[in-house]
Structure formats: C-alpha cells, structure tokens
Amino acid sequence: RPSTGPRPGRPRTGCPSRAPPRGGGGGARAAPAPQPGVSDLPALVEQMREAGLPARLATEGEPRALPAGVDLAAYRLVQEGLTNSLRHAGARARAEVTLRYGPRELEVGVADDGRGAAQEELSGTSGHGLVGIRERVALYGGILSVGPLAGGGFEVRAKFPLKDGQ
C-alpha cells in the first residue's frame, strides 16, 4: 500500500512544509520583559499592602541610575524581605523598606516589627530565599546583614558599593 503521509510517531522528512511558520512567522522573537529594579519598589510595596502587610517605603538621598545587576539585586532583596514579613511576622506586623543613596553606596533594607525568624531560616536550611539574596549581594560586592532586631522583629539589609557617577 502506498504511503499518503508521514507515519505516526515519525518526523516528516524530505519535503519542506508549505504551511506558514507558527507564531506569526518572520523569525522575530518577542523582546524579553525588562527586569524589575528599585523604580518598581513603590508598586511592590503597594502589592504587599493589598496582600495584608502594612508597609511603607522611605527613600533617602538622590535617586539615580544604578548598574543593572545592583538594581535587580536590590529589588529582589526587598521582594524576599517583604514576602518573609508577610509569611512569618504575624498578623499585626508592619514593615518598612528603606532605600538610601549614598555617595559611594546603595543601602537597601526591609525591617518588620513582627515575631522574628526561626534559626533554620537564618541558617538557610529552610528555603532558598535568603540563600539567594546572600549570593546576589555577594555577586555585586555587597555586604548583607540578616537577623532579629533588638526590640523585636526582623531585618534584612544590604550595602552595595557604587562607583563615582553611579
């Protein structure tokens, strides 16, 4: 019996397809979505408020363009810090995000007045969030401090070095 097309389970070979390419053709790919940065922090803080965490953003110094990696790392630190506050700080906790532009560094932090964190969270054995933040901060030459606050609550804070003009 003569073949009338490719057999099931076998790729078609030999004859080029006459059908237009899938996805609109032309070979053009969609541009990747831009990475978030510190300019997106007001929207992130608002999302956390809507999710039930009273949060505010305080900015000190003159905002300026940051190296892309530092910009993303700072955003991710705040995202992780606020997410942890929402999950672990307790029903009545509040969070504050601080962003300080210094002449040669960017300092970014999240502090809450909640319950704090369990030791396994601090050591990085109960998830990957803080481990990922440690790695991102180190990648850009920053210094990370994570831990309970003296009066209760918890803080995640990083300082990223900036070159002149950044």
Predicted feature locations:
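Glycine-rich ATP/GTP-binding catalytic cores of kinases/NTPases
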Residues: 2-166
